[in-house]
Amino acid sequence: MQIRKEKKHAKFRFSFILLFIFASFAACFALYMNSDNAIPVSNSNTEETSGVDSDGLYENKTSVVNPVPKSDHAQDGYFDNVLMLAPEQMRGLSDYGTVPRDNLFTGDFTPSDIMTSLAVSFLAGKDYSSLYIFFGTDSVASQDFDSLAELISDINEKKTNVKIYLVSAIPIKADTETETLTNADIESLNSLLLRFANESDVNYLDLNTFLVGNDGKLPNSKAEAVGDRLKKDTYLEIADFLLTHIA
């Protein structure tokens, strides 16, 4: 009888051990499955957070799109409320009646010259909607934009509603290129000007690309035979370009 009891007792203990092992295995398996399920959730949250952070990292910090793309044509009288600082070459814009004479100031400006208090004084005298600063070939030799940056800062402080446009230097004819001034030099200046405009959050107008010929130079058909004066039709084309590229 004792032998049977011992056998029964041994069976009971062995079954209990098997049950314990099975339960332990089931518990471990459940933990493992829960752990696996947790991983995708964690990855999902990470991906969502990463997506938000990525948008923030690559978000364009400027509010301008440069070069300014083509837009609807400006309303009549648009040039009555703008101020333009430009090289002497651009005087034709007022000579042919597109821009009022009182709104166009011409001279051989460099970035340093433009910075003078004259521009701020002009703006202070009238509520202009926009300021256009044209760059000429004289700017090629002086590519320091620190003074221009100061001017833009001053204008933004005094006239927060004024839109600022930096207009690229235009190409020159093949027969006016020299060792110290080429169309490649002008393109280099314009590249720096575009970069400066983006960093300063101001508008940039690519007038150079609008006028340049297939050979990378100003076509003779757009300019007078002598000097750097442009044809009347070219000035009218430039005026229309400005009126159809409003930021």
Where on the chain are the PLM-derived regions?
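Active-site segments of SGNH/GDSL-like serine hydrolases
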Residues: G136, N156-E187
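Hydrophobic membrane-insertion alpha-helices, especially the h-region
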Residues: S15-L31
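N-terminal, intrinsically disordered, polar/charged segments of Gram-positive cell-envelope systems
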Residues: A30-L83
